[in-house]
């Protein structure tokens, strides 16, 4: 994958993170990087006042630093700001963070050295992953703390995850024949003053969110058939006047997934049955025919449509940030001068992740309510209470499974609260309004994990209902899904420890084979979600 600074998508990030794709640096952009670096070093030697080149940092900006302290200044910055806490990011997220930082530096406005970008690329290609604690970023001035842990590794200090082991960075670099960086003017600040931690984490979360969206479409088509729902609410003619592309797409995809089902009902048939039962006389007659289903069956395009459109909006903001210069100060060729500003501020990513978190939470809200309708004996049609295959009462069936989904759905309501408006001042009130973007991105990752559990629990319940109703009556895509899943998840009929069943289904829906199943049966070409 060629890194130019301008053309990465969240799916490129996924290739580097999950498929361990390697990167190469665009030669023309390397020339630009070299020019900006040379200019930065020349200005530093000439003692031109430039923030972070020959001044203190943050509120200490009035302090001029003589050029003989250039390396000490940058190393002090990195060591003092490698102050993260909590559990470390997973290796795939670390790869995304490094890729985001590399792409930013390759734009050539930061003053980074060619050696810096080459070593960062080597870390990605060789699978050398700095250990980055998740806590510690305010999201402005960028992600100082998490990125300092990357910078620490690049100068040969700290620890890295390498080939499944956490080791001292210096030992790994010696084994791999790599030389630690020697930092010149702005060499440390260039690495840490930006939004790359929140952006990398957001890219990973957004990719997972799109998978959850597709999963929710499939689960809904399964759920509608389990309860004999009507296909009428998914007819295209009813959605075009609403004017929202996401809603039209969701209705279209569910129509396709329902085609060929023997379990769904047709609206015209429902009307005929209602007339037949009422006798069309003068008496008030309760026909027992529901022309309209409950919202979990009927309003899915109006619920998941906004989710898709919100994900697409968040993707626009996150990918623009991914391909941006989010550093300070910036180094320009023409005219030869610097720009002192605040491109490190993470408000775009913070707000994008807040929107993303609401959208992902809504997927979970819908799935949990669908699960409730599927197991509730008062509203689940002819299915047994809590999907117990026999002897309901003696057997509990999916009673405990609902508790899992409902408890997580409640937890998600707290996680979905916005972080981007929860600013607290710091750094001697220099950083007096911050984005908390990394906090929001971390919540995005957690929400995707949580909602994945809810949706996979719903799919497990639908699979159980499929065993009860007869899989041969479902539409071909769902019949295929049940067939694949049933190889490892048979009819649940003995109240064995149900968490094992849920773990099996969770692993199944997150696997490559299931992702291929989604691609086969879902055509999202009309939206950026399909890229």
From Swiss-Prot:
Keywords on record: Isomerase, Lyase
Transmembrane segments: none
Residue numbers of 2,3-didehydroalanine (Ser) PTMs: 141
Keyword Ion transport: no
Record's keyword annotation contains Hydrolase: no
Residues the record marks as active site: 51
GO biological process, one term: toxin biosynthetic process
Record SUPFAM superfamilies: L-aspartase-like
Homology family: Belongs to the TAL/TAM family.
Role according to the record: Has aminomutase and, to a lesser extent, ammonia-lyase activity. Primarily, catalyzes the rearrangement of L-tyrosine to R-beta-tyrosine, which is incorporated into secondary metabolites called chondramides. The aminomutase activity mainly produces R-beta-tyrosine but also S-beta tyrosine in smaller amounts. Does not accept D-tyrosine, L-histidine or L-phenylalanine as substrates.
UniProt name for this protein: Tyrosine 2,3-aminomutase
Organism field: Chondromyces crocatus
Lineage: Bacteria, Pseudomonadati, Myxococcota, Polyangia, Polyangiales
């Amino acid at each position: 994958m060629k890194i130019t600074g301008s053309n990465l998508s969240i799916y490129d990030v996924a290739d580097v993170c999950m498929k361990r794709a390697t990167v190469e640096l665009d030669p023309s952009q390397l020339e630009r990087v070299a020019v900006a670096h040379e200019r930065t070093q020349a200005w530093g030697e000439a003692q031109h006042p430039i923030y972070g080149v020959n001044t203190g940092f943050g509120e200490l900006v009035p302090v001029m630093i003589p050029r003989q302290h250039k390396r000490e200044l940058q190393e002090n910055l990195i060591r003092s700001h490698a102050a993260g806490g909590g559990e470390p990011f997973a290796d795939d997220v670390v790869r995304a963070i490094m890729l985001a930082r590399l792409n930013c530096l390759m734009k050539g406005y930061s003053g980074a050295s060619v050696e810096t970008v080459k070593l960062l690329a080597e870390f990605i290609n060789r699978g050398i992953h700095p250990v980055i604690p998740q806590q510690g970023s305010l999201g402005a001035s960028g992600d100082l703390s998490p990125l300092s842990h990357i910078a620490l590794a690049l100068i040969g200090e700290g620890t890295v995850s390498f080939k499944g082991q956490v080791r001292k960075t210096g030992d790994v670099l010696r084994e791999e024949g790599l030389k630690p960086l020697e930092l010149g003017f702005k060499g440390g600040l260039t690495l840490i003053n930006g939004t790359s931690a929140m952006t990398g984490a957001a890219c990973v979360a957004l990719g997972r969110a799109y998978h959850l969206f597709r999963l929710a479409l499939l689960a809904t088509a399964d759920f509608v058939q389990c309860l004999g729902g009507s296909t009428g609410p998914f007819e295209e003619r009813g959605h075009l006047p609403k004017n929202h592309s996401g809603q039209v797409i969701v209705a279209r995809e569910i129509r396709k997934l329902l085609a060929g089902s023997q379990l769904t009902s047709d609206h015209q048939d429902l009307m005929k049955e209602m007339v037949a039962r009422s006798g069309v006389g003068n008496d008030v007659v309760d026909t027992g025919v529901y022309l309209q289903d409950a919202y979990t069956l009927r309003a899915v395009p109006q619920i998941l449509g906004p989710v898709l459109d919100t994900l697409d909006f968040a993707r626009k903001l996150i990918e623009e940030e991914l391909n941006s210069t989010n550093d300070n100060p910036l180094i320009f060729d023409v005219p030869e001068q610097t720009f002192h500003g605040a491109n490190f501020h993470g408000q775009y990513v913070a707000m994008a992740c807040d929107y993303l978190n609401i959208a992902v939470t809504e997927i979970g809200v819908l799935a949990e309510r669908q699960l409730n309708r599927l197991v509730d004996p008062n509203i689940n049609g002819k299915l047994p209470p809590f999907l117990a295959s026999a002897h309901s009462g003696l057997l509990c069936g999916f009673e405990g499974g609902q508790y899992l989904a409902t408890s997580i759905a409640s937890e998600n309501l707290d996680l979905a609260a916005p972080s981007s408006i929860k600013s607290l001042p710091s750094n001697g009130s220099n950083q007096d309004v911050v984005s908390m973007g990394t906090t929001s991105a971390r919540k995005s990752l957690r929400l995707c994990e949580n909602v994945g559990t809810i949706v996979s629990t719903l799919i497990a319940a639908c699979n159980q209902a499929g065993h009860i109703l007869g899989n041969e009556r479902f539409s071909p895509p769902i019949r295929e899904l049940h067939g694949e899943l049933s190889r490892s998840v048979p009819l649940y009929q003995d109240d064995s420890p149900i968490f094992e069943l849920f773990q099996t289904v969770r692993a199944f829906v997150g696997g490559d084979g299931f992702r291929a199943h989604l691609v086969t049966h879902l055509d999202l070409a009309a939206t950026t979600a399909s890229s």
